[in-house]
Swiss-Prot record:
Source organism of the structure: Escherichia coli O1:K1 / APEC
A single GO molecular function term of this UniProt record: exoribonuclease II activity
Originating gene: rnb
All residue ranges annotated as the RNB domain in the record: 189-516
Function summary: Involved in mRNA degradation. Hydrolyzes single-stranded polyribonucleotides processively in the 3' to 5' direction.
Descriptive protein name: Exoribonuclease 2
Major location (coarse): cytoplasm
Domain S1 motif: 561-643
Keywords: Cytoplasm, Exonuclease, Hydrolase, Nuclease, RNA-binding
Amino acid sequence: MFQDNPLLAQLKQQLHSQTPRAEGVVKATEKGFGFLEVDAQKSYFIPPPQMKKVMHGDRIIAVIHSEKERESAEPEELVEPFLTRFVGKVQGKNDRLAIVPDHPLLKDAIPCRAARGLNHEFKEGDWAVAEMRRHPLKGDRSFYAELTQYITFGDDHFVPWWVTLARHNLEKEAPDGVATEMLDEGLVREDLTALDFVTIDSASTEDMDDALFAKALPDGKLQLIVAIADPTAWIAEGSKLDKAAKIRAFTNYLPGFNIPMLPRELSDDLCSLRANEVRPVLACRMTFSTDGTIEDNIEFFAATIESKAKLVYDQVSDWLENTGDWQPESEAIAEQVRLLAQICQRRGEWRHNHALVFKDRPDYRFILGEKGEVLDIVAEPRRIANRIVEEAMIAANICAARVLRDKLGFGIYNVHMGFDPANADALAALLKTHGLHVDAEEVLTLDGFCKLRRELDAQPTGFLDSRIRRFQSFAEISTEPGPHFGLGLEAYATWTSPIRKYGDMINHRLLKAVIKGETATRPQDEITVQMAERRRLNRMAERDVGDWLYARFLKDKAGTDTRFAAEIVDISRGGMRVRLVDNGAIAFIPAPFLHAVRDELVCSQENGTVQIKGETAYKVTDVIDVTIAEVRMETRSIIARPVA
């Protein structure tokens, strides 16, 4: 009798529209209950029975109930699930399988089965890729997943690599395909095989993509030819190899090994500028005046060269610093190293005065055994030989940026606009409280940004620099020329790593069009989106593998008195994040480890400080001694404790 009653339907509709609702993201806790976080200020309690309908990270709409002054949320509608495709560890066997997602806040096993056509018999401990198929808020009785890919078995030593690559849906190996002969590009190549070109790289590098030749000119000026490997001499635009490189966008460098953008025959052999092998190159000839300015007579041209020596960073640095027993194999090579060091000195001074120079941070290198075990992690400081190559590459990229801008008006540019204009006033106010006065308008210009950076670099500590980092915008890849505030340059376009960056291959093709006097097509904006996304995924993969290896490396230090110097990198309500100075590992120090009485402790992300009883006890950039309290292998997290 009530079935089609319009009054009843109207009443239901009314009740529904009058019931308060909220949209937000579910945050799970270890204790079974959770919270619906609507924004930074507002959250609602979700009781344990209701949490069974949702998963940490789900975006949902919930009905808000009020009982005795207490509000709680009842999940009603799924807006966006947190899990769609994920990696995890399989439990059970054959017909009764479940998968536990590999995520610090997802502990529950999700029932699952293998997808049709997946020929693997899953067993306990296997790693797999899964996709969610059912969700209680979609009208299903429970969560349910389908296993779509077998990754590896549980005890595989290389789990960190295979699981991470599967998680980010990245390739595991080099692309297939081989280039058998060079293309006829209609380019006249200068024969520079008689010149003493050298490469400077790590001892283990196989994909050498830059060689250098320097010459002193009579008037005190210096000339540099930067010769870059020429993969576009082998790979035609739109070919199968080109399409594969376009998707990968970059070589993916992970601790212990890399997954190249191009087939290894090209990256490590045909294109690699090996010593005593004749190779085609794209080259740039530039002249530096006595103060390091790049003169206007920049020349791009195609050539063939033969590198006369594969030099190694540390050996070159030792020789220039008069230490070690390595010697250049001939006076001609020694003269090249001396001239390149002069160019580096000049360009370094020019950039210091007219642009910006990054502070030197060490690179951390994992030394791995046969089974992927971490034998050691070494900090490799950036020395004079690293700076020689860096200055040569930056100069070459400035040249490409100018030529592409002036001749074509487009290219693949690295653009960084400094501070977000919306943050300019807040930035000026923050700096003022620390005694630095800047004009909110001026700081948005390249000159104003550089002026501020130089003032910050002159500060006794990096504390203020760390405070303003959050006001900066991100670097972007653009087809339009634009400034790079971070480098302090009017324009910057890379072309010096075409073996490992697809954007550099595009710039090679554009520069070749300029050399031949031909018209060129502007690259499509979609390619910059793909490159930015791939760069993000590759960085996340490198970080994930690193976290896993750091946890393995430090596991036996947990609970011991071994001390580590650690720099505070971030402070949040829950505690501090620190970076171990000797090996680069990130560890977390929970607030209770800083001071036992919670009411006397204030951890402020806003101020970058920890106060105890009103006194500043710690601040970002401080270096403190810590011990390792615990290493949680299942979440690859390292918990540290300050040394009292």
